[in-house]
Amino acid sequence: KYVRSKTETCGYVAGISFVNQLGLTTQMPAIIEIVTNKEATNGRTITVGSQKVRIKKAAVAVSDNNAELLQFLDGIGQTEKYTELPMEETIDTMLSYVKQKHFTKEQLSEVSSVITGATAKKLIEWGMIYEFAS
C-alpha cells in the first residue's frame, strides 16, 4: 500500500532495511522504514501484521522513474553507519548497484533538489557520480 499501488510506485524501503538488501549488513531492523507519497506527516509508526513500520513523507514525489534512485541516495547516507564491510568493499558494492540500475544523469538532475551536501560529497568522493549514464 505504501510502496506500490496496483499501477504505480509510490514509495520505497529506506534505512537499514535497504542497506541490508544491498548486502552491506546482516542487521535486520526492528522497525522497517518506508518513504512514501501516501503520508502527510514527517513520520509515524504503524503495525502491519506483527511488523512495526515507520512511514515518512517523501521530500519529492516518488514515481516508477525515480524510486530506486531516491532509495539509493537515501542509502548513501546510511551506509557508513551500518556497513559491516571494509569501506573499499562498501564503495565497490554501491558502484555496482549504480551500474546495475543504469541510473542516468537526467534522473539525478530531476531529484537534485533533495540531495544533501553530505550525499553529494560521497557521490563525488566515492566516484559514483561518474557512473551515471548520459
For the regions a language model picked out, list residue spans one by one.
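Generic structural signal for residues positioned in beta-strands
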Residues: 33-34, 54, 71
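A short, charged helix-loop
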Residues: 47-57
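Short gly/ser-rich loop at a beta-strand->alpha-helix junction or flexible surface loop bordering the NTP-binding
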Residues: 7-42, 47
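Residue-level detector of solvent-exposed, low-hydrophobicity positions
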Residues: 19-20, 29-31, 53, 60, ...
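Hydrophobic alpha-helical interaction segments
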Residues: 57-134
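Short beta-edge/loop segments at beta->alpha junctions of small alpha/beta modules
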Residues: 1-3
